[in-house]
């Protein structure tokens, strides 16, 4: 009888052991999932956010801006870095709003070069001209950005970038980029043409890099809220 009771007690303890170990295994799995979620949140928080810029699922950065008082969004391009996309947005915003624009890089003197060379308070660029200026400004930023093999101070980088932007904007003046008065109609929706301030048609189609302009140049969308101009 004693031997049978001992066997019964031993078998019962063996059955109870997995039940006692289950809470620890569940707690370890929950802790691992929480730690992974924390890591993902930390990665997202480390990414600097710029106005007019969003990241796509495959890692590229896109920029677009809404034309004031219109349903039109102007596509500014797809870039390898958030900074380049933010530069494109800044230049486009300067074209639309002038000196009062709230920029991603307000301390950059290249913004003032743009205003001095192209803009005044009463002029606006056509949508595709804005696309071209923004894309070339972003490409200029990438061209003058320091590489890992070259060591330079931030002031040196700003100096080279400003020189590049100054040269870039000067080339647009030399090529007679169309400027139009803000009171005139700058785009004819019916005929798909841009207009000079005297109403003459202007079919502007710059040859942009296909890797930069991946989507439609601009498109209509009244319901989706876009980035604030303030």
UniProtKB/Swiss-Prot annotation:
GO terms for cellular component: nucleus. Disulfide bonds: none annotated. Induction: Induced by jasmonate (JA) and ethylene. Down-regulated by freezing and heat stresses. SUPFAM superfamilies: DNA-binding domain. Residues 40-51 have a biased composition (Basic residues). Transcriptional activator involved in the regulation of plant development and tolerance to abiotic stresses. Involved in salt and osmotic stress response pathways. May be regulated by the stress-related genes RD29A, RD22, DREB1A or P5CS during stress response. Binds to the GCC-box pathogenesis-related promoter element. May be involved in the regulation of gene expression by stress factors and by components of stress signal transduction pathways. This is Ethylene-responsive transcription factor ERF012. It comes from Arabidopsis thaliana. The lineage of its organism: Eukaryota, Viridiplantae, Streptophyta, Embryophyta, Tracheophyta.
